[in-house]
């Protein structure tokens, strides 16, 4: 039996789902991504959201200004879909290379999504335009009806929104983001070449027991919420199979500690510092390291029609302890796996 590999050399990865926030928070978190990833799809759920070409250009510049010298990083901007969005603005941004994709948040599904879409019909002209110009739609796939249990919202979304939408707009490219259920894993696996998915490290590593048994762990609380272990296992099996329409999307979502550790805590895991090593650990546990590079660095560009990165990075298999916290101007940020010993990390 061969000893496990101590170094993994892979083509530089991309993060196809990332929150960078703004202001001081942005300046703090950007380097954790720009150090490792060549590109990242940046979420538009600021307050106010990014709904115009002008706003996206300005936000992109703020991100680039926060990238340390020596990092070669390209933020890929997205447009936040609203009921009142002008299709011409969206097309202009796409044609000018400002918008890479557009993001569909059902109204009030997650952080800063109150401006989101109230119904698919309300944005049908926009979606039809996206289908025509080949612009990908990124979907937070949960229904938000009060009568639907939070653990069932993704499965309901497939049936009531996603499938009717894809039947109606058969040429639309769709990324089902941060999938968390066996239902979604099966749906994407059985779909055609115009449907892909991202998966976060926390949904591969943990299930709802980890978050709730023996005490509530607020730093594992994110949306979509962690599900049962059968769903976690389905996600792990999907990535381990080498399926090529699933790719890395951390959904790294920083919140200051006092906003996570409170009587009404915010959803989101700040996993940018530890995500890549976490994914490597999962692939190793599943005896699937041969598919790790494709998941991180090839499948995403392939789906988006972009070139793969031409530089490489190395991960090293040696135990390291994750920092307990990261300083902010007037608070701290608790990273995913804070204080824990991890098996894989990016070689500095």
UniProtKB/Swiss-Prot annotation:
SUPFAM superfamilies, alphabetized: Metallo-dependent hydrolases (SSF51556)
Gene behind this protein: pyrC
NCBIfam families, per database record: pyrC_dimer (TIGR00856)
Protein name, entry field: Dihydroorotase
A GO cellular component entry from the record: cytosol
Binding site for Zn(2+) 1: 17, 19, 103, 251
Cofactor(s) needed by this chain: Zn(2+)
GO biological process per UniProt: 'de novo' pyrimidine nucleobase biosynthetic process; 'de novo' UMP biosynthetic process
Catalytic residues as annotated in Swiss-Prot or TrEMBL: 251
Biological role stated in the UniProt entry: Catalyzes the reversible cyclization of carbamoyl aspartate to dihydroorotate.
Any GO MF annotation of the entry: dihydroorotase activity
Position of the signal peptide: none
Manner of cofactor binding, per the entry note: Binds 2 Zn(2+) ions per subunit.
Organism of origin: Shigella boydii serotype 18 (strain CDC 3083-94 / BS512)
Entry binding sites for substrate: 19-21, 45, 140, 223, 255, 267
UniProt: Zn(2+) 2 binding residues: 103, 140, 178
